Amino acid sequence: MTEKSNHLNQPSSKTWSGRFNEPVAELVKQYTASVGFDYRLAEYDIQGSLAHARMLGAQGIISQDDVAQIEQGLGEIMDEIRNGEFAWLLDLEDVHLNIEKRLTDKIGDAGKRLHTGRSRNDQVATDIRLWLRSMVDDALSRLRKLQASLVALAEQHADTVMPGFTHLQVAQPVTFGHHLLAYFEMLQRDAERLVDARKRINRLPLGAAALAGTSYPIDRERVAHELGFEAVCENSLDAVSDRDFAIEFTAAAALIMTHLSRLSEELILWSSPRFGFIDIADRFCTGSSIMPQKKNPDVPELVRGKTGRVNGHLVALLTLMKSQPLAYNKDNQEDKEPLFDTVDTLLVTLEIYADMLRGIKVNKDAMRLAAAEGFATATDLADYLVKKGMPFRDAHEVVALAVRHAVEQGCDLADLSLSQLQKFSPEIAEDVYGVLTLEGSLASRNHRGGTAPAQVREALKRARALLG
């Protein structure tokens, strides 16, 4: 759908104006109108209206001639919208009444019969579900591409040694591939959450009408089948009043953004001169207006920043719903802008992130040097002593003393002589030096989920299988 046409603040009679003695104030019109943002639902609104009209015809509620006129008119309106020729009127409040008014102008009384057995309450709930279902499918597709980019980079670095961190302090050696696959696992759970949320999105509210259902002999299952819904909402009050499906999606989106924010923080650190682990492609960075040497990682910084935006939308939607009595309330008009912006932010972030990962260059030497300088094999020395029969807590104390001595000497554990090491424990023998290598440390974690290169390759196979 193209961007909305100009909003024309022209007078027009409202569908509900018969009850009132005076027109709505102009400022109130502007305050209450939603067409400035819900126009995005137009194509889905038309899809729902077409299915509703066909059902009304099949049930004998309106004539087949009316159905044919409605189909013709809505088809023409769809073309107008796609071509940017549709005039959205602020005076008509929202996407639904704008389309209905245009339809009635085109086909007369047949257009007035379209809303039979329907309310804007179940209409908008249907529109949002149709739209969000499509957006979830788009997000899943982009998420899979991002996961594929992670796997491709991890495959290149299944053996690349880097320091693993806790508290941002060097902890133990891992491989860069293993580190990247941690994010693959997070995103895999995110994908599962989206798939699961889609099941609850994919329920048809139409037929609930305003709140109590309708007295017309409608066939909700027929409409659900035509629109691709798995089932109908079972309670009319619930169908029109709750937006938990939108909140659930936004929560899933917030988790995706949070995971990408964590990775972004690491990319920012790793690309800094203090680390020098990676180089982010120039097309994802910007310079400084005053400092000629600067190369700023703007994309990961913005991902980190936009995560707060999406998290804020989640809180906004939760707060929106928390005090509403059943059934529909005008408060729910405020669900769309946070939801729309969440989708927009998520989709572009997923797309740009996949491309950014493909452009990363890795400095293997810098990674290895950082792992070698941080006593990353200290735990391996403790495990070595445990395998010699020493209780782990005693081994922990022995190695801590050895590390302190190495710090005082300005060297690593592997640089200490055998006699120096044996001062801390006579159990230490010549074979300890094989344990204190980075490769030895990695190879010893040779179990499912471990960081041994062989296990990383097995994990990569499983990841590829998940992606298909």
Swiss-Prot record:
The kind of enzyme this is, by top-level EC class, is: lyase
Reactions catalysed, as given in the entry:
2-(N(omega)-L-arginino)succinate = fumarate + L-arginine
The yes or no answer to whether the keyword Heme is present is no
Localization per Swiss-Prot or TrEMBL:
Cytoplasm
**Gene Ontology cellular component list:** cytosol
* PROSITE patterns given in the database record: FUMARATE_LYASES (PS00163)
Q: What EC number is given for this enzyme?
A: 4.3.2.1
UniProt xrefs under Gene3D superfamilies: Fumarase/aspartase (C-terminal domain), Fumarase/aspartase (Central domain), Fumarase/aspartase (N-terminal domain)
The terms under GO molecular function for this entry are: argininosuccinate lyase activity
Highest rank taxon of the organism: Bacteria
Q: Which PANTHER family match?
A: ARGININOSUCCINATE LYASE
Q: Which keywords label this protein?
A: Amino-acid biosynthesis, Arginine biosynthesis, Cytoplasm, Lyase
GO biological process per UniProt: arginine biosynthetic process via ornithine; L-arginine biosynthetic process
The pathway this protein participates in, as annotated, is:
Amino-acid biosynthesis; L-arginine biosynthesis; L-arginine from L-ornithine and carbamoyl phosphate: step 3/3
Family, as annotated: Belongs to the lyase 1 family. Argininosuccinate lyase subfamily.
Q: What is this protein called?
A: Argininosuccinate lyase
